[in-house]
Amino acid sequence: RYGEKLATPDVSVSDLIGDIDPIKAANLKLSFADEKVIHYGIIPRSNRGIFVINELPDLQARIQVSLFNILQEGDIQIRGFKLRMPLDILFVFTANPEDYTNRGSIVTPLKDRIESQILTHYPKSIETSLAITEQEANILPAQKDKVEASDLIKRLIEQVSFEARTNEFVDKKSGVSARLTIAAYEAAVSSAERRAIIHNEKNTQVWISDLSGIIPAITGKIELVYEGEQEGPYEVALNLLNKSIRTLFVSYFPNPDDLKKKKPVKKSTTQTTEQKQPESPYALITKWFDAGNHLDLLLDMKDEDKVIALYKVDGLFGIVKKYFPQADEKQAALLMEFVLHGLAAYSLISKKMIDGKIEFKDLMGSMMNLGTMNFEEDDYSDYQ
């Protein structure tokens, strides 16, 4: 009941509709004038069913013309035969909404014969995008048993695509592939699985640091404008990941920018004073780093070692328990790491990659250092 054909440049009328089969005529000793020598194509064989042609613009114009009669009169014509075969077929055609290549186009009379044109669009909400990724991602049962991906990780990955669609370095019309989040989610799970195998762990979860593994998925799924090419695909992808962390951080914890602002309060008609702000919930964390402490998180770090390292930071566990009192040990550890990346995204602490590890330090001390504050592409490539 279902037939499908990918429109490649080598598709012919014979493939779709049919042609005379000389071998069949010779074997059956039939004249070419006999209708029995006809070899029917995929469309007649899909009668009383659904037939789909994918990537319609790739179909040559002369082949598209051969579909006119089928769509309008509902019959087929093969060679010189006076053959009228009524067909009962539901035709479906697919094409990219933004065809920015020079491969061809849909001829106007054929487009006129297509009864309805449904225009697709990117998912309007994170929830819709999450459902699509969950449905399409190819995560094996063994991976699901070994690796747990929290809702936070899934939303961060989806947010990357939303950030890309509004990014100045990414082409606005067709710069973001619909497969970006699917490939990124699979890459994140694979990164966590690889780490678990290295340390012989029975199960693990996807950490924020594992999202460094989705950078190749992002660079291969976005089309950059000229300025983006100058910036570099890797830097743009890393910037998108950091922006998604920054955007999503305020959905889980207080906005650090709001805490920096001091509200003026009128004291009298002639005097104004600044209202004293309550101490920031991140004060203990930033003070710990200001005291000269630093935290190193290896990309291939064991879960147990990472949790121990996170608990060294003063106030980190406290802020997670304050806003997420119901979080279990695994969730709390992930949120603790998320807080560090979030504070780095809001420039309260610094974050940089050195030899396969993420180093968190105080911002002032890092500014005195001439090193970069971001992941280095060469460092990451060592861990592929």
For each predicted feature, which ranges?
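Charge-rich, low-complexity amphipathic helices
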Residues: 38, 89-93, 128, 132, ...
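Canonical AAA+ ATPase core
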Residues: 1-42, 47-144, 187-199
